[in-house]
Amino acid sequence: MVNLKKAVCVISGGMDSALAAYKAKNSGYEIVALHFDYNQRTMNKERECFNLICDDLDVEKRFILDVGFIAQIGGNALTDKTLNIPKDGISENIPITYVPFRNGIFLSIAAALAQKEGCEAIYIGVVEEDSSGYPDCTEQFINSINKAINLGTADNNIVIKTPLVHLSKGDIVKEASSLKVPLELTWSCYENSEFACGTCDSCRLRLKGFKEAKLSDKIPYKS
């Protein structure tokens, strides 16, 4: 049976974007997978996880795009190794791991790809409720950039779907488990590629999710 609807899925290699992609597939979309290399610390590991997730989803069309200019802009600890990754818990302020306007850049490129590939939707795994407080992960931001994208594209009908935006990390892990998303193929650590540090914001949020879901995380952590 020919699949009549297609979606660009922005897949970082982390568990949130992985779940969003599985939800897209379960909603009947043919996936066009999109991944970005921006010279982040765990770039090679994230790319590896992206391909493993795509393999599990049987995704044929994959795009890995070099957006290294993000590292040239700098101003964040994910690309600038002279800046330390915070290890003192989730802050009320926007942390130095925030990459300025990253999702705005990613979604603009995803919109161009969606138009070229004839996709009616873009799936992205942003989480507002249980996160590090990045301003480009909010529902308000997504709705606003969706309007801008449709003003700037020919058909004006691309929908950005954020199925995780109001979920807690515990809910994300539970739902991923129920959908048989292989979370052991995903990576969250900001700092390391072999053994997750367990103490950066992203690791803390991931571990919090598994604890709330009463499940064990199968990826390796520093002992």
UniProtKB/Swiss-Prot annotation:
Residues given in the record as Zn(2+) binding sites: C189, C197, C200, C203
EC class of the enzyme, as a word: ligase
Enzyme Commission code(s) on record: 6.3.4.20
Claim: Metal-binding is one of the keywords in the record: yes
Alphabetical list of InterPro entries matching this protein: QueC, Rossmann-like_a/b/a_fold
Function: Catalyzes the ATP-dependent conversion of 7-carboxy-7-deazaguanine (CDG) to 7-cyano-7-deazaguanine (preQ(0)).
Name by which UniProt lists this protein: 7-cyano-7-deazaguanine synthase
Organism from which the protein derives: Campylobacter fetus subsp. fetus (strain 82-40)
Taxonomic placement: Bacteria, Pseudomonadati, Campylobacterota, Epsilonproteobacteria, Campylobacterales
